[in-house]
């Protein structure tokens, strides 16, 4: 969590004070589109499709907004949103929880995917079918404390010993390269890396987090903003979410067309991967929720309790301040 605070301090130092000149100008005339920005959490992928659909199909303009989609840089979306350098961002429940413990008031305003689709993936020849099979293997991660906590939690359900698992940092190494060379398994999001494996004809075994603990069925990713933005300009937040909701509803109902929109916006993406990933995600964006983006208090409480139990949080947060469904279309 110290890293989170350091990142925010750097952004604040760079940012200075006050609104950007663009936003000052954008608020000048009623008939002008209001300029706002949304920062991605990663390079563009199908988690982000609803944003690109809303942009391409004019949903943002219909709501009076001129939205710039920004790639994440050295400072991530959370830090930029917290510092007021971006109005919106893409985050995850874990990061927002950690930020609020540090007194940084960012808020989740919509769940992009209703359930956690991540898990531990391995080539079938590694014969890793359950957490018990992690013993004697090598896990490749990125060095975050949450990784060992999740691995331990899953292994405990089957009486396995975390000390018999070798955990290494694989950095930016590609999953498919790493599992052939350095590691036995890694933590992936099936909608992208899992679907890519299908296209490559490389069969995987998946150990999904949600198969072993309902407390690990947290929201990832989510759309975020700041408490300050909600307080000073709730109408813009409402307009943004109205357009984004239409974008994701379109992606749910028309995955092939939504994939074309993402490919047009980001031509460097693999068209086959985008198309198949979009098909896989379409029914999972909303899943069993009453509407896209909806969040539940118990999901926030469950994951906070799990993080506290594993020593990943210093104190509880008020989960009802960490998320809101207020800005979703009625």
Protein language model regions, located:
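Short, low-complexity disordered leader/linker segments with a strong preference
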Residues: 1-35, 62, 328-330
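Short polybasic/polar patches that bind polyanions
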Residues: 13, 55-56, 61, 100, ...
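Short, glycine-/small- and polar/acidic-enriched structural segments
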Residues: 25-171, 176, 180, 184-188
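Short, solvent-exposed loop/beta-turn-alpha elements that line the ligand-binding surface or hinge
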Residues: 59-62, 132, 209-216, 283-297
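Pocket-lining segment of extracytoplasmic ligand-binding domains
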Residues: 94-95, 174-177, 181-266
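Short, surface-exposed acidic
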Residues: 162-166, 266-279, 314-321
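Secondary-structure end/capping motifs
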Residues: 231-310
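Conserved C-terminal helix/tail region of periplasmic/extracytoplasmic solute-binding proteins
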Residues: 300-330
């Amino acid at each position: 969590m110290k890293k989170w605070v350091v990142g925010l301090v750097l952004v604040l130092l760079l940012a200075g004070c006050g609104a950007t000149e663009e936003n000052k100008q954008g608020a000048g005339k009623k008939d002008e589109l209001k300029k706002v920005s949304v920062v991605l959490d990663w390079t563009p992928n199908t988690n982000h499709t609803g944003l690109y659909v809303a942009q391409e199909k004019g949903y943002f303009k219909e709501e009076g907004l001129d939205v710039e989609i920004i790639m994440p840089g050295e400072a991530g979306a959370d830090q930029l949103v917290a510092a007021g350098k971006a109005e919106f961002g893409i985050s995850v429940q874990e990061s927002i929880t950690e930020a609020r413990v540090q007194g940084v008031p960012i808020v989740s305003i919509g769940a992009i995917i209703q359930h956690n689709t991540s898990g531990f993936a391995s080539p079938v020849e590694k014969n890793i079918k359950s957490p018990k099979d992690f013993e004697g293997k090598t896990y490749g991660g990125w060095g975050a404390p949450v990784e060992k906590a999740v691995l331990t939690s899953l292994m405990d359900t089957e009486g396995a010993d975390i000390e018999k698992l070798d955990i290494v940092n694989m950095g930016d190494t590609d999953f498919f390269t790493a599992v052939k060379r350095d590691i036995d398994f890694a933590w992936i999001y099936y909608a992208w890396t899992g679907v890519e494996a299908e296209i490559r004809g490389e069969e995987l075994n998946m150990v999904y987090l949600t198969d072993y603990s309902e407390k690990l069925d947290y929201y990832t990713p989510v759309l975020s903003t700041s408490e300050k933005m909600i307080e000073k300009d709730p109408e813009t937040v409402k307009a943004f979410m109205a357009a984004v909701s239409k974008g994701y509803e379109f992606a749910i109902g028309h995955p092939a067309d939504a994939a074309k929109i993402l490919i047009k916006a980001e031509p460097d993406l693999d068209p086959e991967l985008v198309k198949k990933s979009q098909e896989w995600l379409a029914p999972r964006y909303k899943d069993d929720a009453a509407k896209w983006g909806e969040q539940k208090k118990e999901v926030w409480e469950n994951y906070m309790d799990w993080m506290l139990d594993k020593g990943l949080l210093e104190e509880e947060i008020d989960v009802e301040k960490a998320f809101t469904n207020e800005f979703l279309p009625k």
